[in-house]
């Protein structure tokens, strides 16, 4: 009988440059400035974020989405959110993470997001549903990828 296991994940790497996540208004999304390629052929990724202290209010969640590189090899997803803009990505893989409505730093991790096929480019999009503009510094978001193994 086979057993399904997870492979050892890669080390965490930046999903966004730190400055990209600074001062994002509540209700806005931002496309990562870092282009990623699934050259390892990994199937899953975990995404972890740390937000500097702010007075977070309801609605209180962070959304994380994956925009694939389109056939034109220059546009990701629907082409929105190259700069911070109002709205939530629709029609693309994503997940939300609840955050506490309080004045404090916030952290969260989502697990097992499906990655695009091997060799395909993609970027992450982060949605601020925290009810307040992000702090002007010290916001970070990283990811790691991995596969499953059947032994």
Which role does the model predict for each range below?
Residues 95-122, 126-131:
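Beta-sandwich interaction modules
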Residues 1-15, 118-120, 127-151:
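C-terminal interaction-tip segments
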Residues 60-65, 78-87, 110-113, 137-141:
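"Short basic amphipathic alpha-helical interaction patches in structured regions
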Residues 37, 48-52, 100, 111-113, ...:
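A structural detector for beta-sheet-dominated domains
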Residues 41-51, 61-69, 116-141:
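Internal, hydrophobic beta-strand segments that form the core of beta-sheet-rich folds
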Residues 54-58:
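Short consensus segments that form the blades of beta-propeller domains
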Residues 1-43, 48:
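Solvent-exposed, flexible loop/coil segments flanking beta-strands in beta-rich domains
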Residues 67-106:
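Terminal beta-strand-rich extracellular "head" domains
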